[in-house]
Amino acid sequence: MAKRGSTLLVKLASSAGTGYFYVKKRNPKKLINKLSFRKYDPVARKHVLFTEEKLR
């Protein structure tokens, strides 16, 4: 079996406050800043900024 890599799963939460989120893989060795993407929020029905939070 293959080794488990160093990638982490992180939650990208909507800044619109709708509670909608995406789950993304992240390599902590390469990225030191928090991830942020402008993606579609179907609850708000528009593109908003999604920022990284810890996945629990």
UniProtKB/Swiss-Prot annotation:
Keywords recorded for this protein, A-Z: Ribonucleoprotein, Ribosomal protein
Keyword Ribonucleoprotein: yes
Membrane-spanning intervals of the chain: none
Pfam families: Ribosomal_L33
GO molecular function, one term: structural constituent of ribosome
GO biological process terms held by the UniProt record: translation
A single GO cellular-component term on record: cytoplasm
UniProt xrefs under PANTHER family: 54S RIBOSOMAL PROTEIN L39, MITOCHONDRIAL, LARGE RIBOSOMAL SUBUNIT PROTEIN BL33M
UniProt family annotation: Belongs to the bacterial ribosomal protein bL33 family.
Name recorded for this polypeptide: Large ribosomal subunit protein bL33
Taxonomic classification: Bacteria, Pseudomonadati, Pseudomonadota, Alphaproteobacteria, Rickettsiales
